[in-house]
Each structure stands twice: as structure tokens, then as C-alpha cells.
């Protein structure tokens, strides 16, 4: 049987305990365990480790709120740590007659483990290392495995969890030989921790909501997330050491393959050229989503691909026909008030969740085809009007992506121009050798840039601020164009070259 979906939690207690603090720690631990029953109601167990290295355990087939009512005192003045587990037993793995050994946390001779997830290769580990476990539940293989091959170090635990164990996990480990230590680890299962200043104790659980509700900052405690694919060692001497569980080929910076979501415009083209200059292997990903400017954008991105000598992947999609309701999709008029100024300052041409949809599809392709990064042309200028250009969206999505891709399939989002406004993007594009003369920015279908929509307005000003005449043509009176560009120098394209190694 598999471990299934559970909630785990516990506490590591710092300093000497008196009766009052022990009671308060227990009250907090019980409230966390009861809240965590949301993620598991088929059994409940708790293991308490004393400062002298002795275990006490209490296990019950009932859910935590019922089981805890009948359990004796858990935390006393000699307690060092405790771990618990609320198990949600999958329908296909129902065990009608559970023994205490079938209820987590799992105990060995020295090691106690509470685990949320599935160990897919438990039988293989059992055979390979000649292990004897006390239950057929997959998690039961972990205590004997650690007792047999773990040297007790953080690095040793990292190696076992990264290279030996196959499956999903958020787990906590106690060792009776070292009662002042706690190890927490997670790949793509959630795990949060909270430092309780008043109680001088570190609590942890499968959700931040179980640790602390909504409180004013001055009334609350620090709550953090254990980052996916991380293992930490925590000591009552205030040791906090962490190590990555990403395999070597998934470590950041080891491989540099980037898939750039490319519209054919200034921002994504500059992003691609900047990455090329930094030594990335780059490919362009373009979506033909039945928008008004589809034809000129498609022509532009194809020419950009040729000019930069990089692959282009095109995806044809009809999805946004269902969403509709945007001038970019042919419904309504493109805003050209005040030569595009108004369109540059407000999202009149918003396409529902467009960037979010593109990001999801790009991440799927990146995972499938071995790209480490998806790069976007989001930028600070357009974030003022379009929420999906905000850097915070990318930052938050990066935190969520380990839960969206397969095990050890790391894909991260990059925003090479995310911190720049439009004239800074043009300057970077000129420096990085982006073929800006091939780009298409206009919301309309041409054949020339209209010169009166929001993107045209920003583009023209951005080039002028840099003292360079925009190389694309605008559908504006020639005399007005000559007057606007007077005093600027001609645009010159210099293809990108990789930066020398060691340069900033």
C-alpha cells in the first residue's frame, strides 16, 4: 500500500521547558494537528522524542480531533520534539484492519519519520538493501533505510532523497541519538514552518493556514515555506543548514536553454538578443491566436528568427475565439486617442489572461523538449497598464512552477527586460544587437505601423529618447515624420555576439 495524501506536522523545542511553556507548546501542537485533519481523516499518530533520546508514541484509527481527546499529555518538561501525521487513505488502498505499525509516523530503532506522499520504489529499496520494515505501507521503508545507509549528515540525507528515493514527499525525520535535531525535506509536496517567538519553538505543517491565521504583523510569528526540492537540518543550537534536492542536471545555471515567448515586437526580440549575448541557447515560441495583427507579427517573428539564426516554433490556436471581447481579437475599436497616449496608459485592448495562457503552454513545451527557462518580454512600462506584465506575477509563478511540472523537471521563468521601461528596452536592444528593424509593435495589421495606437506611441518615443530614428515605417504624414525625427541618427543593426566569459 502507498502512503497516500497526508498532512504532517510537529515541533522542535528550544531551551529548557517549564510546566507552563510545555503546556502552551502542547496546546499549539494540538491545534495545528486538528486543523491539519483537513488533509487526512483516516488515522492519526504522534511521536514525541525526549531530551534523553526516548520515544513515546500514540496512534489511533480515528481522525485527529477525536483521537486527541483521548490521548494523554504529549509534551512535558523533558520533551525535545514531536512529529504527527494525519493520513488520507486512498480508496484503492483501504486497509480495514490497521495495526499501530500501519499508522504514521513510522518508527525504526532510532529513526522516526512522518511523510506526506508516495515512495514508488519501496520494494526495490527493500530488496537492494535487505531492509526489514514493520508495515507494508510504503513509508515504512524509510526508517530502516535511513538507519542502514544514512551517515547522519545533511549531505548524506540529500543524496538518499535525491538519488535513492523515487516518488513524492514532504517529510520530517527525528533521530533518537540526536534529540536536538530535526530534518525537514520536500520535493513537490508542501511544507511550511513557523518560528513562535513566545514559545521558543519551531512548528511545521503541510499548510501555512494550519500554523497561523490572519493576524496583525505585530501579533503574529514568522511563517516560511520550505522551498520545493530542499532539505534542511535544524538544531536547538540555532543551526539552520539547507541543501538542494534538484539533481545536477537541474541545478540553476548548469544548462542554459531558453524558450522565448516571442510576439515579434520590441520587448521579446530584445529579450532574445540579450539572452543570446549572455550565452544562452535560444529558441523562439510564437502564438498565432487569430488576433488582428497576426499576419505582420508572424512575418516579423520569422524574419527575426532568421536574422538571429535561432529556431522558431509556431503554435496556431483558436482558444481566444471563445474568450473574445477584445479589440485585439477584432471586437471593438483600437484606442487611438491622443496619438496613442491613452492606449499606452490603460489596458483598453486587454485579452483575457493571454500571457497566463501563453506561459502555461510555454512551460509545458519547455518541460517536454528539455528547455530550462521560459523567457518573457514582460516589462515595467506595460505593467502600469497590463497586470500580466507585472514582475510580481512572474516571481509568484516561479514559486509555483515546481508543483506544475514533473518530478525533477525544473522550468523557470525569466524576464530579461522585466525591470526596464520602453526607452531602456530600446537602448538594450541596440546594445545587444536585437534586429529591431524587423519587429512589429502595432496593434493593427498594417502594412505600416499606424503610429496612433498605444504600442506605436511608446515605440516612437522610446526611439526618440535614445536619439535614434525608428527603422520601421509609420502611416503618418511624411512632413510630420521628418519633424518628429529631426536631430536623431540613423538606426544601424549590429548582430549580437556572446559576451566574453567573466564579463558582467
Residue ranges of model-derived segments:
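Predominant activation on well-ordered alpha-helical scaffold segments within soluble catalytic domains
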Residues: 30, 140-143, 205, 302, ...
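Short, charged low-complexity linear segments at domain edges
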Residues: 417-443, 481-482, 487-488
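Conserved residues at the C-terminal ends of beta-strands
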Residues: 12, 377, 459
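Long, charge-rich boundary regions
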Residues: 476-504
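Conserved short alpha-helical segments that host acidic/polar catalytic motifs at enzyme active sites
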Residues: 1-253
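ATP-dependent adenylation/nucleotidyltransferase module used to activate substrates
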Residues: 254-432
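Local cysteine-cluster metal-coordination motifs and their immediate loop/turn environment
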Residues: 7-8, 43, 356, 360, ...
